[in-house]
């Protein structure tokens, strides 16, 4: 870093939040006196800075020619609105002349008339950059500075009358009134002044501009569009009273009021003819993504499709439980959307959604078992009297059945019923599992008949190799009728073996 003397004084430009900066633990930037005018844009106060080089925690940095430190001492405070501060800097060696234009613009922006007069004494042309200083004063609403500039020959009509545009944009009603006296065109730049007065909610100013010829319909009724988008209810109401077209731009005003959740404005626009149907379902999806329950309820009440799969997906993916409840309140049939909701809830681990579905008497356990989702079943508090186990076995989900059995010692299962259906469905693994439990089926002949009917030779072999003297006459007849030669041969062989034994 550059060398500096032990007692060298540095400078920092600070703003109105200076006390917050002083108490901060952030890195502090400062400068030498020869660069101080380059930092005017950062505030309206000047602090003299010394460096606590004897502090063992002190660190000094240089970044792209900028000086900063983690610890500094704040000394004398100067007001940059006071010409004496600039005199002091010049006396200390600061070269002000190369910076006069920037100082002029900075002072005009802040309304520091004394500083403007100060740099004027140095011979600076107040009209530099096509009277830009005057436009900056209008932007800030510094009327004393505006009047001073006009008295000293600056033209308020310079740059296509843009002074009135800035004055209106930033809500400076009195400044606009001053400028109009000098015959500025309030419709300049496509009615910029009115458009931005409406954008920022300045009703009194907007009314004044309209009374003086500003066009409320400029830019395809931009005024009511932007006022609606920005949430200015009273401005929207005022513009409607002045004849603004609420349907302009394919109901732009209503569309964006809804997108910003300004329902009170949306209702106002609809009252005067705006059509909500244009983007109804798209806005519902967007509102769900924002988790805006008020807007979703409003759209649902106005006919939006709450059964839209994108809506359901969005709500469950983001775990918006209150939003789901809102849709139910407005007519969503949970049972009809059960598969979509539970599939996403399972994938995203949304237990609160699953618990809510259970509270609404949706049989989530049955759904999980039917689809063979062991991971999902494990997410559910299991209260099963045996039906879930039976269903899992009949559908061939042995892992789920074993889990349910492990979670409930007080279950009742009709294993004979399960055995018959397992044989019918050809569930070899389930049949073997049931037999391994040393259960004794009560309807073996019936099970054999179902296995034969559906062509499950492997099931027949398991049963008939274990049990003797099973009546299979009907099954032999079925095998002939169904043209199952392998099954027929096996059954006849079983019958012959019985007779031999």
From Swiss-Prot:
Keywords, alphabetical: ANK repeat, Repeat
Top-level taxon of origin: Viruses
SUPFAM superfamilies: Ankyrin repeat
InterPro entries xrefs: Ankyrin_rpt, Ankyrin_rpt-contain_sf
Pfam families (alphabetical): Ank_2 (PF12796)
ANK repeat placement: 67-98, 100-128, 129-158, 160-188, 189-218, 220-248, 250-278, 280-306, 307-336, 338-366, 384-413, 415-442, 443-472, 474-500
Gene3D superfamilies named among the record's database cross-references: Ankyrin repeat-containing domain
SMART domains in the record: ANK (SM00248)
Protein name: Putative ankyrin repeat protein R760
């Amino acid at each position: 870093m550059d060398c500096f003397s032990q007692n060298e004084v540095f400078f920092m430009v600070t703003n109105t939040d200076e006390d917050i900066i002083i108490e901060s633990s952030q890195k502090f930037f400062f400068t030498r006196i020869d660069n101080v005018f380059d930092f005017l844009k950062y505030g309206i106060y000047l602090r003299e800075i010394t460096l606590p080089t004897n502090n063992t925690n002190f660190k000094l940095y240089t970044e792209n020619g900028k000086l900063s430190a983690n610890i500094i001492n704040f000394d004398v405070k100067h007001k940059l609105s006071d010409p004496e501060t600039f005199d002091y800097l010049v006396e200390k060696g600061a070269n002000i002349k190369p910076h006069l234009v920037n100082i002029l613009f900075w002072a005009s922006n802040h309304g520091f008339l004394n500083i403007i007069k100060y740099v004027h004494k140095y011979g600076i042309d107040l009209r530099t950059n096509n009277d830009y200083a005057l436009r900056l004063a209008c932007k800030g609403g510094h009327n004393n500075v505006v009047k001073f500039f006009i008295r000293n020959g600056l033209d308020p009509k310079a740059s296509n009358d843009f002074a009135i545009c800035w004055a209106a944009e930033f809500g400076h009603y009195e400044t606009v009134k001053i400028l109009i006296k000098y015959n500025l065109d309030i419709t300049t730049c496509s009615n910029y002044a009115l458009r931005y007065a409406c954008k920022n909610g300045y009703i009194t100013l907007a009314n004044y501009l309209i009374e003086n010829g500003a066009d409320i319909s400029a830019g395809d009724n931009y005024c009511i569009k932007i006022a609606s988008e920005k949430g200015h209810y009273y401005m929207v109401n005022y513009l409607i009273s002045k004849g603004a077209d609420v349907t302009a731009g394919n109901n732009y005003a209503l569309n964006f009021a809804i997108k910003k959740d300004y329902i009170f404005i949306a209702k106002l626009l609809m009252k005067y003819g705006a059509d909500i149907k244009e983007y109804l379902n798209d806005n519902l999806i967007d509102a769900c993504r924002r988790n805006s329950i008020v807007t979703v309820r409003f759209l649902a009440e106005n006919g939006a499709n709450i059964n839209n799969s994108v809506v359901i997906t969005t709500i469950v993916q983001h775990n918006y439980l209150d939003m789901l409840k809102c849709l139910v309140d407005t007519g969503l049939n949970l049972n009809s959307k059960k598969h979509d909701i539970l599939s996403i809830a399972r994938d995203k681990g949304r237990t609160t959604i699953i618990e809510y579905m259970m509270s609404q008497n949706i049989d989530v356990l049955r759904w999980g078992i039917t689809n063979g989702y062991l991971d999902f079943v494990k997410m559910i508090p299991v209260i099963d009297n045996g039906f879930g186990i039976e269903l899992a076995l009949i559908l061939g989900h042995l892992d789920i059945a074993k889990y349910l059995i492990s979670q409930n010692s007080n279950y009742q299962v009709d294993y004979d019923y399960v055995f018959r259906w397992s044989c019918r469905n050809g569930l070899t693994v389930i049949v073997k599992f049931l037999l391994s439990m040393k259960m004794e089926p009560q309807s073996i002949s019936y099970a054999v008949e179902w296995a034969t009917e559906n062509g499950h030779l492997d099931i027949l072999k398991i049963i008939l190799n274990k049990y003797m003297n099973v009546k299979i006459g009907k099954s032999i007849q079925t095998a002939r009728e169904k043209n199952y030669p392998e099954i027929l041969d096996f059954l006849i062989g079983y019958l012959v073996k019985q007779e031999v034994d």
